[in-house]
Amino acid sequence: MTSLHTLLFSSLLFFIVFPTFTFSSTLLFQSFNWESWKKEGGFYNSLHNSIDDIANAGITHLWLPPPSQSVAPEGYLPGKLYDLNSSKYGSEAELKSLIKALNQKGIKALADIVINHRTAERKDDKCGYCYFEGGTSDDRLDWDPSFVCRNDPKFPGTGNLDTGGDFDGAPDIDHLNPRVQKELSEWMNWLKTEIGFHGWRFDYVRGYASSITKLYVQNTSPDFAVGEKWDDMKYGGDGKLDYDQNEHRSGLKQWIEEAGGGVLTAFDFTTKGILQSAVKGELWRLKDSQGKPPGMIGIMPGNAVTFIDNHDTFRTWVFPSDKVLLGYVYILTHPGTPCIFYNHYIEWGLKESISKLVAIRNKNGIGSTSSVTIKAAEADLYLAMIDDKVIMKIGPKQDVGTLVPSNFALAYSGLDFAVWEKK
């Protein structure tokens, strides 16, 4: 009887701390940038200071950097996957402490899963560095050249042909190898059960077939998962982004469908690319030929994760810095699952503005599959109604005429933006 009472209490406590989230209420937060490993006192320890603010903003899932030993300090050249004590972000104990603190605030942690490639400990004359160690006392993840794709141009192993794109910084792992599938799945499940992660951010999913992502999702049952499928967009001869990016967003949709859908989402790079061009006086871009949002959120919003910048794009494909808040006005009032970037929320002083927008989103029940009616998409004005509950506009044009009905009241406004709620 005591055991039963304990079980019932534990179950009740779980649902109090972790209410049942659907994609409609999910809100992501990327907790790091490319320089976070340099944090004095350790990144994991430093993040404790921001947990209350992150929780108060309504964040449900927090994306953490790759946790394993890595040749590169940022974590994206992992080697001994079970070794979490050699990470530049902090120790295994510090990571577990951070995740526990997040859990106590009802926030679930996502691990950055880098499995397309892996760095090795020893080399031979043919394959180069192709002898791997897993970071345990046994032979888990201790691999040799037979676990490396045989058509890797820089590290020619003896495994199966690569099922995706090449990455020349480290050997491409053969994900068709049954032992690779088994041991990586076991490692990911260990990250869940022993470390406390609830889900995954899959790095560089272009590096292996979509069926491989599907397999790891099925084998690990994450609460939430998102893949990084970053393809080039189309540009015209003048160097400007083409208006029609349907092929680009269709590629994201196809990847989701082939990888199984469900809890799996994809970063909406289409929306990011279009939005950062649109805010430069080309807001007409934000309406496709069918009158819908032009990104992935226009065709598969329930599996789209919208964002303004991340640790990579912030260095190489950055959103116009003076228009970042306009970007958040857009993604936090539109369908899809928004992801807030550490730099903008913590370092740029946008905490209050972003929190206000999140509050409006949550108050009105705007979610990943909310409806959008675009009422204006001109060079200097974009105005849309979401779920017949919220109207938003971005752009310098002030006169919106009769586009905002009298039964809507201004909820929040600033330079070149406004948000109204239904009375």
Swiss-Prot record:
Enzyme Commission no: 3.2.1.1
Induction remarks: By gibberellin, abscisic acid (ABA), heat shock and infection with the bacterial pathogen P.syringae. Not regulated by transition from dark to light. Triggered by NAC072/RD26 during senescence.
Catalytic residue list: 203 (nucleophile), 228 (proton donor)
GO molecular function: alpha-amylase activity; calcium ion binding
SUPFAM superfamilies recorded: (Trans)glycosidases, Glycosyl hydrolase domain
Xref: Pfam families: Alpha-amyl_C2, Alpha-amylase
Family annotation (InterPro entries): A-amylase_bs_C, A-amylase_pln, Alpha_amylase, Glyco_hydro_13_cat_dom, Glyco_hydro_b, Glycoside_hydrolase_SF
Signal peptide: 1-24
Family affiliation: Belongs to the glycosyl hydrolase 13 family.
PANTHER family attached to this UniProt entry: ALPHA-AMYLASE
Subunit structure: Monomer.
Protein's name in the database: Alpha-amylase 1
Lineage: Eukaryota, Viridiplantae, Streptophyta, Embryophyta, Tracheophyta
